[in-house]
C-alpha cells in the first residue's frame, strides 16, 4: 500500500460474504445509494461498484498523515459489492486486485455460517494486512432468533461490528474502519 496515491485513486473496499446476508443492503447504505430495504431478493451478478466520498474535519485530517501530507479532506471510496455465489469464483482474483480493505458480511442469526469468516479471510485477505479487514454481522429486520457470537479462529483480533436493520451502527463502524485504513497508509 505504500505506493498508493490518495489524490488520484479511490480507496478500493471489497464487500464479501455468503449469499443472502445483506452485502448489497450494506453497500447501498454506505454509498448513500439507497436507505430503503427491498423486501424482494435480487442476487448480485458478479460484482457491482458503487462510489462515495468521506469528508474529514481539519482535526481528523491532522491525525491522519496521508491526508495532511496531500492537503485533502475528502476521500473517494469505491465499494465493490461482490456476489456470494461461488459460480463467480473465477473472477475473484481480478476483483480483489488492488483492494485496500475488505468488509466481510455475515448473517447475525444464522448458524450455517459458522467458520465462514476464516473461509472468506483465506479467499480474499491473503494479500491484505489482516488489520485492513473488518466484519459486519448484519441482523435483518425479519430475522428471528438470537444474534450468534461470530468470531474468526485464525484472526481473533478482527473487529466484528453488529449492524441491525435500522443501520444505526453501520456508518460509525464504517468510518472507524476507513480511518484505520488511512492511518496505516504513509
Segments predicted by a language model, with ranges:
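TRAFAC-class small GTPase G-domain
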Residues: 1-186
